[in-house]
C-alpha cells in the first residue's frame, strides 16, 4: 500500500464507529478491600495493565452491587487506562481472557468491539504508534492526564474486511510473540554480564585469574593478607562547606559521582574555598575515592579510581574519603579489590545507620583486610580484568543496539499490518472476501444499521 492509499476493500473510520466505550466502576475508598470476599468482584486498575496483558498480583475488590452487567470484562474487551498522572500510562491497553469474573475501575474504560469487528485487530491497533501518538496529543489535564470518551471520535483506525482483520490479528500474534521472545532473551544478557563481571572480580582477588600465569614466574607469587591501613599514605575526608550550582569557585564532586569501579567527573557542583583548603583537598590522578555516607546501602563504601583528571582543580565533599597508597599497591588493583563481592560484603558489614543515612567510618575502611600480591602480579591482574571487562562492554553495547532494533521492530510490524502490507498476498488470493458485501464499507453500513435499530451508540453508552 502506498502512502495515504488504502488497500482494496479497506476504509478509514473513527474508533468510536466500531467500538462502544464503557466507563469503569465508581466506588469510595472505604468500599474497596484487598482480598476476595463473598459478593465482591476483583477490579482492574491502570497499574494492572502491563505490556498488553493483565497483572493480577495487586487487585482490589469492590461490592458486586456497584458493578453493572456491562462493566464486567468480556473476552472481547480491550481495557484502556483513561486517566493517570503519567502521560505514558494514559491509553495503554490490555486484551486478555481472564479465568474469573472481573470488572474495572473509574480510571479505566473498555473498548467493546461491535460483533462484526474482530477484537484482536482492535487490541493490536491500541499498541501501534498510530494510536499512541494520537492518544498523547489528546490527553490533557492540570495534574492528571485524561482521555475523554469523545476522544475516540477523533482517533481514526484503518478497517479491513472482517476476514482480513482475523488474518492480520493472527499474523501479528505470531510475529509479535517472536519479537517478545527475542527481546526477553536479549534482556537477560545484562544480568549474565553483571554476574560475569562479578566472577572476574572474585577471581582477580583470590588468585584464580592469574593462577596459570604464576606457574611461569621465576619466583612464587604470594597473596599477602594485611590491613588496608598498612598500604596507605593518606586517608582524608572531603570538604564540608556547602557547594553551589551557579558555577562559582572550583568544581567539586557530588556523592553520586563515585560508584564501584568508576568516578564520574561530570557529576559536579562548585565550591569557593581558601588556598590552603584547595591544596589539602585537590584531587590528582591515582586517587582512590570511597563513599562515606549514602541513603542506599549498596553505595556505601564503594571505591572508584580517578584515572585521568579532567579539571585543573577538582575537589571532593565530606561524604567522600580520599585514599593515597604506598608504592607496594597499584591503585588500579585496589579499586578492583574493593569492587569484588567478598570485599563489598566485608565493607557493608561495617556500615552503621545514623538519622536515616547509612555510613562507614575512616577507621573501618582502614581496618579492611586486603589480599595483596606482588606489584608485578597486581599489574597482570589489572590487565586481565580490563581486557575481560572490555569484552563484556562490547557485548553489552551490541546487545543494547540489538534491543533498540527489536523495540523498533514491533512498531515497524504494526505499521505494516495497518497499511495492509502483511496481507497483500492474502488479498490477491481471496478477492471475494474483500469486495462487495464483504468489504469494510459494507461492514460499516451493517454496524450503522444495527446501531440505529438498537437505539444508537449514545443509548448504548447510557446503558453502561
From Swiss-Prot:
Superkingdom in the source lineage: Bacteria
A Pfam cross-reference name: Methylase_S
GO cellular component, one term: type I site-specific deoxyribonuclease complex
GO process annotations (BP): DNA restriction-modification system
Signal peptide: none
Induction data: Encoded in the hsd locus, in the order hsdR-hsdM-hsdS. There is a promoter upstream of hsdR and another between hsdR and hsdM. This probably allows expression of the methylase enzyme before the restriction-specific subunit.
Keywords linked to the UniProt accession: DNA-binding, Restriction system
Molecular function terms from GO: DNA binding
Function: The specificity (S) subunit of a type I restriction enzyme; this subunit dictates DNA sequence specificity. In the presence of the R subunit the complex can also act as an endonuclease, binding to the same target sequence but cutting the DNA some distance from this site. Whether the DNA is cut or modified depends on the methylation state of the target sequence. When the target site is unmodified, the DNA is cut.
Comment block on domains: Contains two DNA recognition domains, each specifying recognition of one of the two defined components of the target sequence.
More about this protein: Type I restriction and modification enzymes are complex, multifunctional systems which require ATP, S-adenosyl methionine and Mg(2+) as cofactors and, in addition to their endonucleolytic and methylase activities, are potent DNA-dependent ATPases.
Family: Belongs to the type-I restriction system S methylase family.
Subunit field text: The type I restriction/modification system is composed of three polypeptides R, M and S. The restriction enzyme has stoichiometry R(2)M(2)S(1). The methyltransferase is composed of M(2)S(1). (Microbial infection) Interacts with Escherichia phage T7 protein Ocr; this interaction leads to the inhibition of the methyltransferase restriction enzyme M.EcoKI composed of M(2)S(1).
Protein name: Type I restriction enzyme EcoKI specificity subunit
Gene name as annotated: hsdS
